[in-house]
Amino acid sequence: MSFSVDVLANIAIELQRGIGHQDRFQRLITTLRQVLECDASALLRYDSRQFIPLAIDGLAKDVLGRRFALEGHPRLEAIARAGDVVRFPADSELPDPYDGLIPGQESLKVHACVGLPLFAGQNLIGALTLDGMQPDQFDVFSDEELRLIAALAAGALSNALLIEQLESQNMLPGDATPFEAVKQTQMIGLSPGMTQLKKEIEIVAASDLNVLISGETGTGKELVAKAIHEASPRAVNPLVYLNCAALPESVAESELFGHVKGAFTGAISNRSGKFEMADNGTLFLDEIGELSLALQAKLLRVLQYGDIQRVGDDRSLRVDVRVLAATNRDLREEVLAGRFRADLFHRLSVFPLSVPPLRERGDDVILLAGYFCEQCRLRLGLSRVVLSAGARNLLQHYRFPGNVRELEHAIHRAVVLARATRNGDEVILEAQHFAFPEVTLPPPEAAAVPVVKQNLREATEAFQRETIRQALAQNHHNWAACARMLETDVANLHRLAKRLGMKD
């Protein structure tokens, strides 16, 4: 089999149709899966000796949240080291990173695997992986044909990374380096709320504004602060952390501003406070709402004038510190109640950010679950940790009052339980491995008897039309992908669509 010009042109066209990089990457992967007739495909970005999934097709959704470190995945390491097409024999002793991650075939291992390293010049920027359940699935394609596919994918990924770098540089001062511009903590999530949060982080990171990060306990406010710092011009200087809720009143002022020898009993030497430690960098004040009103007044002075006084010292010290503050309280309500200073609130909330709770992030829970599964796999030395369909369904329907932190602990506990009940180093997480409390549901209301306005044939055809429309929308109006989703032959689907009046 050989690729026609039309096939390659179609792949190139799909890359241009997408709105934004994510959509283009998904179109590329979906099209490749159709052209190569593989069971699963993935586009991965290479960064710091790990592969980060950008788009997948035919794989469990939690793969998008996983981070594949080369040390734990010898096949991916082989792809990263290769300068060309890598074909793994069906009897390869190297474990496939996607074993157990093809929906409906969790217990089966991938047989055919091809890896295509992607380069920008001499630099490895990513990889394409193609997997199939038949041992000889890719034998019909020559290395030259696969190189053409890799070249198209590498061009798309390289352009996306270049645009990302240029956009980041435009937000930073002119003397910032490209490396500083793109360096940023990974925040996992594709939900609208997280997408908006990432955009706001990019905007505010390049400035020197104080930021107030609000959100429920366990949502990841510290991770947001870290992302802001690492994407800012201050990234080369320290990010200093202080949990205000853990500060005893007697030592709080010393922790913030430092003290001199003899300032109080036990002050046997001079000591720098967090503000001095964060000079020219960033200070992250977690749980800012827990500070006393007296300390709030002193913190306000630092924000206003940029100088501090160590406890027991009459001299002032100048500091250049950006303050990021976080709280799980509604500080506006705290101001009205007289527990938080209004002037400090306005100083801190120049650019407020809100981290959405996990229950409002949709499928992000599955991506995060995949991330934590991969973490557990590496820590416990397991060959694979996968989520069953029942476990994924449970995670999607639980509300997680403890947010991401609760999910992380739940995954770790489930892995330990599942490992104890299985022999070997492969773990499949089932719903019974999670100890979530029962959720009391309201009694169902009596359903009204529907008024029948169609005969059985009309109702059936209306249902078929709507099902096909939804499948087409989810697959970018690609009929072949739609047929695969509906588990029917594409020719039969075309005939049915014509009979239903959906095609000429």
From Swiss-Prot:
4-aspartylphosphate, modified sites: 57
InterPro entries referenced in this protein's UniProt entry, alphabetically: AAA+_ATPase (IPR003593), GAF (IPR003018), GAF-like_dom_sf (IPR029016), Homeodomain-like_sf (IPR009057), NorR (IPR023944), P-loop_NTPase (IPR027417), Sigma_54_int (IPR002078), Sigma_54_int_dom_ATP-bd_1 (IPR025662)
Gene Ontology biological process terms in this record: phosphorelay signal transduction system
DNA-binding stretch(es), residue numbering of this chain: 479-498
Keywords: ATP-binding, DNA-binding, Nucleotide-binding, Phosphoprotein, Transcription, Transcription regulation
Pathway(s) of this molecule: Nitrogen metabolism; nitric oxide reduction
Phosphoprotein among keywords: yes
Domain Sigma-54 factor interaction span(s) in chain numbering: 187-416
Listed NCBIfam families: PRK05022.1
Function: Required for the expression of anaerobic nitric oxide (NO) reductase, acts as a transcriptional activator for at least the norVW operon. Activation also requires sigma-54.
Protein name per its UniProtKB record: Anaerobic nitric oxide reductase transcription regulator NorR
Protein's organism: Escherichia coli O9:H4 (strain HS)
